[in-house]
């Protein structure tokens, strides 16, 4: 008995959790062929197969174009001179200066340590870029727990082209994308992924100009 024969004839479509096709599209194609019924995937809770699949394809494309992934490594600092990043340093390659024509800051917000704070201020930990945040700690939060919290809007200050600022001056060869940016509450608005994708696409266009 085939899957198609086992289905009631009045089914117009099948809604299926998005769990097929992690490595390639063959699983999806086979499943569609077996049921012979319009098949639509429903996105489950993250991390979803679709999201992981997209991430894998992007990384494969990155590597095929000469990109290098430093697995489990972490950028810990760098040098800015003449309003441009000269190089970055990392935990596992302490003697190497990582140099590029352009740099993209996609470190996220507080949860991923793209932003940090102490008892006095909020700061960007890698290059100490300018951060838009209140200097009064009492203004970081609201008493109402479920309201939008002021600290959720804090982030790295940039110009219109997403170049971050350092001491009020534009860092010309660096861009910031995603939830590290100021003025966007991705937690309350639940649109962090969309903003990350759109700002990344815009920055890619800026670099390719």
Language model features by range: what are they?
Residues 2-7:
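Short, small-residue-biased leader/transition segments that mark boundaries at the very start
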Residues 16-26, 40-60, 70, 188:
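Short beta-strand to alpha-helix junction loop
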Residues 59, 77-97, 103:
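Conserved beta-strand-loop-beta-strand element in the redox core of flavoprotein oxidoreductases
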Residues 65-75:
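A conserved beta-strand/loop element that lines the FAD pocket in flavoprotein oxidoreductases
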Residues 92-95, 101-113, 180:
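Glycine-/small-residue-rich beta->alpha transition segments that form the dinucleotide
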Residues 94-95, 131-136, 140-186:
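FAD-binding beta-loop-beta segment adjacent to the flavin cofactor pocket
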Residues 113-119, 172-174, 179-209:
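A conserved FAD-binding loop/helix module that cradles the flavin
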Residues 117-140, 197-202:
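Gly/Ser/Thr-rich active-site loops/lids in small-molecule metabolic enzymes
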């Amino acid at each position: 008995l085939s899957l198609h024969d086992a289905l009631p004839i009045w089914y117009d479509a099948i809604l299926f959790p998005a769990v097929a096709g992690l490595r390639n599209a063959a699983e999806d194609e086979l499943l569609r062929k077996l049921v012979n019924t319009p098949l639509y995937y429903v996105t489950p809770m993250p991390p979803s197969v679709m999201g992981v699949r997209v991430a894998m394809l992007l990384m494969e494309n990155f590597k095929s174009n000469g990109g290098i992934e430093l697995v489990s490594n972490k950028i810990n600092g760098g040098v800015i001179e003449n309003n441009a990043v000269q190089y970055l340093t990392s935990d596992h390659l302490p003697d190497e200066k990582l140099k590029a024509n352009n740099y993209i800051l996609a470190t996220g917000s507080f949860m991923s340590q793209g932003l940090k704070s102490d008892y006095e201020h909020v700061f960007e930990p890698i290059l100490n870029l300018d951060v838009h945040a209140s200097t009064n700690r009492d203004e970081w939060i609201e008493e109402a727990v479920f309201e939008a919290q002021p600290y959720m809007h804090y982030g790295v200050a940039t110009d219109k082209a997403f170049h971050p600022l350092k001491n009020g001056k534009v860092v010309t060869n660096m861009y910031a994308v995603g939830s590290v940016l100021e003025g966007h509450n991705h937690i309350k608005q639940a649109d962090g992924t969309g903003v990350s994708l759109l700002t990344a696409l815009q920055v890619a266009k800026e670099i390719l100009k």
